[in-house]
Design a protein with these regions (language model features):
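Glycine/tyrosine- and acidic-biased, solvent-exposed loop/turn segments at the edges of beta-strands
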Residues: 2-5, 15-167
Length: 167
């Protein structure tokens, strides 16, 4: 009986100890700039944040099980939104969008499993089209068009597996 009780207590202690040591999530990883200011805080689960060396917020990215997962946002030092990036399992996934400091949309890029996949669009600060490119699995495939700032089409080509077709 005493042996059974000792065994059960030992087993219980071992189980509790193992769970408390190995069951906890890692602490938040912190990095600092040379000037001593906080550069980034990256949790195993939760919202990671980074700052510019001057202290302004630089980015916020959600983490699940130590991997980027969800909608991340980045800002210019002046506070204007720079990018929104969708992540899934530590890779870009879905539509990412970028802006000029002035607030006008700079571009949109589709991603699948961390690679360009879909139409990549860019605009001038005026809002006029700058370029449209098509990608499949990270490689340019399809029509590419580029415009001058006045709206004049200056280039049109077709790409297959990253190589321009010569007509």
């Amino acid at each position: 009986m005493k042996t059974k009780l000792t065994f059960l207590l030992s087993f219980t202690f071992l189980f509790l100890f193992y769970g408390s040591v190995y069951g906890e999530e890692p602490v938040v990883k912190k990095e600092y700039w040379d000037n001593g200011k906080l550069k980034s805080e990256t949790p195993y689960n939760g919202l990671g944040t980074s700052w510019w060396e001057t202290g302004e917020k630089k980015s916020k990215i959600p983490y699940i099980n130590g991997k980027k997962d969800g909608l991340g946002t980045s800002w210019f030092k002046s506070g204007e939104k720079m990018f929104t990036t969708h992540y899934k399992n530590d890779k870009e996934e879905g539509l990412d969008t970028g802006w000029y400091k002035s607030g006008e949309k700079w571009g949109e890029m589709d991603f699948k499993n961390g690679k360009d996949d879909g139409v990549q669009k860019e605009w001038y600060p005026s809002g006029r089209k700058k370029s449209f490119r098509h990608y499949k699995n990270g490689i340019e495939n399809g029509i590419r068009k580029e415009w001058d700032e006045d709206g004049t089409l200056r280039y049109e080509g077709n790409f297959v597996d990253g190589v321009e077709e010569i007509k």
